[in-house]
Amino acid sequence: ANYHFILNGITTIQNGASATTSRSTLNDGDTITAELTLVSGCVVSATVTLIENIVTAGTISPVNQSICSGATPTIITGVTTPTVNPLANVSHYWQASTDGFATFNNIMSNTENYQHPTGITTTTQFRRVDVSELNGQTCSDTTVPVTVSVNAPPVGNLLVNGTAQASITICTGDTPIFTITGGVASNSYTFRINTGVVTHTNTPSFDPVALGYVFAPGVTYSVDATIYNKPLVAGNPDPTACTNNTSSITIITEATP
């Protein structure tokens, strides 16, 4: 018997005694015809058409995000659907990585959009995997990743009269000065006494007496601050700023003898 394999009705791939053959390069829509010639001279043939399971990933948005540590990323939405063969079945799943997809985790299946359920503390990339299934053959392609950059909270230590301490006793009429060390020039601050806001400021120092605050004798006060990583906007904290709260300092006021 003789086996004759023909590409697109023109090109002979093999013509001989072997019933199998191979070819490294084939294209969508190519046809392969196999002709079997028996010793008797009878000829039978069959033709198959090759359909390539092409998939080109869609796009997702936003391109990148920047959030504060512990915040939840905004929803990542599918902008365009993948390009596939019209006869293919399409599905999706999502992946997350903190090392540029050297390693990654599969995190959700068969959704065009993705909402991360919790806050994150490490810069993370997310991408969608678009899957095409056609005639039992599964192929996939990944979208360009969305990078969610995590900004570390601002740092600083609250001092009173230049010293870090949990509490201080003052006499009536004394002027405790509070400062925050360890910050950067672009930070801003909210200083509070007994949870009430006394001032918003771009400077890391707080003189409550100069602002008219009176420490009454026999009363205990708690002073703390919030640090923002952006300057004030129209005298108020920037709502987009990342924040960090200092520890509190207890002020015990005694009457002057």
Specify the residue positions occupied by each region the protein language model found.
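A short beta-strand segment in extracellular, disulfide-stabilized domains
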Residues: 1, 71-83, 172-182
